[in-house]
Amino acid sequence: MAYTEASAEKIDALKEMGVHLWQMPNKNGHVALRPLLKKLAEAEISSILAEGGGEIHASLLEEHLAQKAYVYLAPKIFGGKNAGTPVGGAGVPLPADAFLLKPTGMQYFNEDLLLEFDVLEGGTACLQD
């Protein structure tokens, strides 16, 4: 488990449960991702699944740390102006600055659909530009 700050009591309790703990640098109130990924590589962990909210997804994209994207679609529509989005962060100002994906696969799981992509570097012009 990676953390930036915790009480000695909490650290001791987690260690007693057998949890491996890594104190990492703080970046904008969260664990700094690049040092964490370096630590994982040193532990011979070469692949992770970052299943989370829009902010972690945005951070991985903005820091060019994501190589693949797996997008699950369910036949349901959620909405509302305050609804969460799959990618948070500041976004990009122009379509040409968007993070590019290359489709690599598609699978159905009952009614749900999994789309698989490679994350490409940089942006290119699109029809709206």
Regions found by a protein language model. Give the residues of each.
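Enzymes that bind and transform nitrogen-containing heteroaromatic metabolites
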Residues: 1-129
